[in-house]
A protein has these predicted regions:
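All-alpha prenyltransferase/terpene-synthase fold signal
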Residues: 1-303
Length: 303
């Protein structure tokens, strides 16, 4: 690649994947498989979209020398985001929720082991994400702010609230405003948090950029949710890597709008996201470049 800035970002994404794959938590226990099961779903792959958003901000805002000095600490935070996201997927796949048998081209944990193990591993990954942040060697004020952002957006005011609404209203059609609220919380808030955490971890205090990243992340997250709803009805398990056609009685954008209108809505959101990103370029060209490259790669996989 001829672009040195993008090369730096892409290389860090690859190094993070290596960091993740070599990360191992040893449990002092005589449980026959809990240690293996703990990190299994994390290691089973995935796009690493949320950690890559976090790294996109850091690689753009922190000088390479300063970044290199803190690389391991940044990777701990990126891993914390991935752990919290993975816990949410494990619980979302449970029989009491989506009852999915496949995730990331592998059997879900409750399908491979049992429901109890899946619940406990989800609980463990949730709490481990905050252990990773608290054990970081970043400044104390940064650690506190990172914990605040992740807990607020991944907890009862964010992802958990969205999941609760999704489950409770499974057989009750919602209107567009309600559906948007649901998915802003269930999906978009953690995406938004990943961007905000990147800014906070950089040590740069920029309230205007913080608010922009928050709003941009919410819109981007909504766009990806609409695209995901479309995938559920248009792709099979082999194409998507997860159990599909589960949204028959759920509140999805396809069920509310129909496939054609949902596809148009996704295209509108995608255009708005890319246009918003272009407006960022004059003030933060490296950040715009990193995010644009990541989004274009991911959009290709969803459209």
């Amino acid at each position: 690649m001829n672009n040195p800035n993008l090369s730096f970002y892409y290389n860090e994404c690859e190094r993070f994947e290596s960091f993740l794959n070599h990360h191992h938590l040893h449990l002092e226990s005589f449980h026959p498989y809990l240690e293996k099961a703990f990190f299994e779903m994390v290691l089973n792959g995935g796009k690493r979209f949320r950690p890559k958003l976090f790294l996109a901000v850091l690689c753009a805002l922190v000088g390479k020398k300063d970044y290199s000095n803190q690389q391991t600490e940044y990777f701990k935070i990126a891993l914390s985001i991935e752990c919290l996201h993975t816990y949410s997927l494990i619980h979302d796949d449970l029989p009491c929720m989506d009852n999915a048998a496949l995730r990331r081209n592998h059997p879900t944990l409750h399908a491979k082991y049992d429901e109890t193990t899946a619940v406990l591993i989800g609980d463990a990954l949730n709490t481990y994400s905050f252990e990773l942040i608290s054990n970081s060697l970043l400044e104390s004020r940064i650690i506190v702010e990172l914990i605040k952002i992740l807990s607020a957006n991944g907890g009862i005011k964010g992802m958990v609230l969205g999941q609760a609404l999704d489950c409770y209203f499974e057989n009750t059609p919602l209107n567009l405003e309600q559906l948007t609220f649901l998915h802003e919380h269930k999906t978009a808030k953690l995406i938004s948090a990943s961007l905000m955490m990147g800014l906070v971890a950089s040590g740069i205090k920029d309230e205007e950029l913080f608010k922009w990243l928050q709003a941009f992340g919410l819109k981007m997250g909504l766009c990806f949710q609409v695209l995901d709803d479309i995938i559920d009805v248009t792709q099979d398990e082999e194409e998507s890597g997860k159990t599909t056609h589960l949204d028959g009685v759920k509140n999805s954008f396809v069920n509310l709008l129909g496939l054609e209108e949902a596809s148009g809505y996704a295209q509108t959101l995608k255009t708005e996201v890319l246009n918003d990103l272009n407006l960022l370029k004059p003030a933060y060209p490296l950040l715009q470049e990193n995010l644009n490259a990541l989004l274009n790669t991911l959009f290709k996989g969803k459209t």
